[in-house]
């Protein structure tokens, strides 16, 4: 008998800016990803202030879900999805971000997507803002550095809440909001890159600006949650974390403290604000020691307290180690890197594979908050190569997912209230961090390549058939 609840939400996850394409179709305006070129594991993508004809912008076509959504959702149905995590592209609804009236063409597109899901019994799980800030808001306001974005965001939320009130139950206010605590978050999350053009590796890091922008996102998220609770009691509201589990590299107490502080800043800070509705005490010292002063309005404390989430969602891909000792080996990671764990193997991109860490993470989060939880991103980015028979035999991906689902089951046995699982990139899409197609996550292979070529045809990988059995058995059949 399965340990997962009978109504467990098995599914998959994607993001509008990474798979929709149609970047300037039907009134859509440019978002930050539309100004980002392609890159690779070894060569960072660029941000440009205008579209340059000598550059390739992968989000412009991506995998063209915009024109393939019925075909793609049919494949999700065949796998047995109970839920599909996707996002709404802000600039499809408000092309510049500040308009007072929404773009009807954009609203109608998501009507069609959600109707298609609901027709087949798939519950949409919708991220309101997933790394696609309107670029016009960057140019005029320097992104979330300006408090004015709170009301623009609320206008956007009100439009989509009312439009999709009978089609969407589960909402996430921001994707991986804690990326704002990291330098890369200036591009991905807060849009505090006004006037910047160059490699993503060279984005200037202004901590004061970054954390002030994050505060504005906290307030916007809380206001959206409270507005939803007051006007649409059927909604379940969340806000998603990029959870980067880390361990002390050694048993040196200095390493233990260093790791505790890293976990606080990277993971618990944003989690505490969204769940407990206030800034944690440990951040006061950190802000003081880093010369950061968060400007708040008198009403902000009440707004944060009144806008706490209903459930907790996070991404989990890997873990790393933290140390105060020098001369230790670095490894790659999701948004941030860390130190090499000698007990773990790594992916093609250097991300350390740690299934047991997922069980540990689930327990740590649940013990802290006692909220229902969903793992809304998890997966293996890998180079998929077609075999002589023309198929993708991705046993490595199956092994990765199997081992993580096994540890999810152990966490449920531990008492964790786990409500769903949506592996990332259920269909191949553009990487947010590197801007490449070669880093593939999907159960479905898309014939699209880093040079922009490909006929966009879809093909089932071995993992497609495996995940179908997993869902049909509610997580019992993992072989």
Where are the language model's segments positioned?
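Catalytic domains of carbohydrate-active enzymes, especially glycoside hydrolases
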Residues: 64, 68-89, 123, 306-312
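Active-site region of glycoside hydrolase catalytic domains
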Residues: 1-53, 77, 96-98, 107-479
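A short acidic, glycine/proline-enriched capping/turn motif at secondary-structure boundaries
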Residues: 82, 91-93, 131-133
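Glycine-rich, proline-tolerant flexible connector loops at the mouths of alpha/beta enzymes
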Residues: 88-102
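Active-site mouth loops of central-metabolism enzymes
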Residues: 54-68, 145-147
């Amino acid at each position: 008998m399965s340990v997962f609840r009978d109504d467990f939400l098995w599914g998959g996850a994607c993001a509008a800016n990474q798979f929709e394409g149609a970047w300037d179709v039907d009134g859509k305006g440019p978002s930050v990803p539309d100004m980002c070129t392609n890159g690779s594991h070894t060569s960072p993508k660029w941000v440009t202030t205008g579209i340059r004809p000598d550059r390739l912008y992968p989000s412009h076509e991506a995998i063209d879900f915009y024109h393939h959504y019925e075909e793609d959702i049919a494949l999700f149905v065949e796998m047995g999805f109970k839920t599909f995590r996707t996002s709404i592209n802000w600039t499809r609804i408000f092309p510049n971000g500040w308009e007072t009236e929404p773009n009807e063409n954009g609203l109608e597109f998501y009507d069609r997507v959600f109707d298609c899901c609901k027709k087949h019994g798939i519950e949409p799980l919708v991220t309101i803002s997933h790394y696609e800030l309107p670029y016009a808001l960057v140019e005029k306001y320097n992104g979330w550095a300006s408090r004015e974005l709170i009301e623009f965001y609320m206008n956007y939320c009100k439009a989509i809440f009312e439009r999709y009130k009978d089609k969407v139950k589960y909402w996430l206010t921001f994707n991986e909001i804690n990326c704002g605590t990291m330098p890369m978050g200036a591009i991905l999350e807060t849009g505090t890159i006004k006037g910047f053009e160059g490699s993503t590796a060279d984005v200037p890091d202004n901590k004061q600006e970054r954390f002030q922008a994050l505060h504005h996102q906290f307030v916007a998220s809380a206001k959206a949650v409270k507005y939803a609770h007051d006007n649409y009691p059927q909604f379940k509201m969340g806000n998603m974390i990029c959870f980067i589990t880390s361990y002390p590299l050694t048993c040196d107490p200095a390493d233990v403290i260093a790791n505790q502080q890293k976990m606080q800043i990277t993971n618990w800070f944003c989690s505490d604000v969204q769940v407990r509705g206030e800034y944690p005490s440990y951040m006061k010292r950190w802000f003081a020691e880093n010369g950061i002063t968060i400007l708040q309005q008198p009403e902000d404390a009440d707004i944060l307290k009144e806008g706490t989430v209903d459930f907790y969602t996070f991404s989990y891909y890997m873990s790393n180690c933290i140390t105060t000792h020098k001369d230790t080996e670095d490894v790659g990671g999701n948004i941030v890197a860390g130190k090499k764990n000698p007990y773990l193997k790594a992916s093609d991109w250097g991300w350390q594979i740690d299934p047991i860490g997922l069980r540990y993470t689930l327990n740590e989060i649940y013990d802290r908050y006692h909220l229902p939880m969903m793992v809304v991103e998890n997966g293996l980015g890998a180079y998929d190569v077609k075999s002589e028979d023309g198929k993708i035999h991705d046993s490595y991906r199956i092994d990765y997912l199997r081992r993580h689902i096994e540890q999810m089951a152990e966490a449920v046995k531990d008492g964790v209230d786990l409500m769903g699982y949506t592996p990332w990139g259920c269909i191949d899409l553009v990487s947010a961090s590197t801007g490449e197609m070669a880093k593939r996550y999907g159960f479905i292979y898309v014939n699209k390549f880093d040079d922009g070529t490909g006929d966009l045809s879809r093909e089932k990988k071995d993992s497609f058939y495996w995940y179908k059995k997993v869902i049909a058995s509610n997580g019992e059949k993992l072989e």
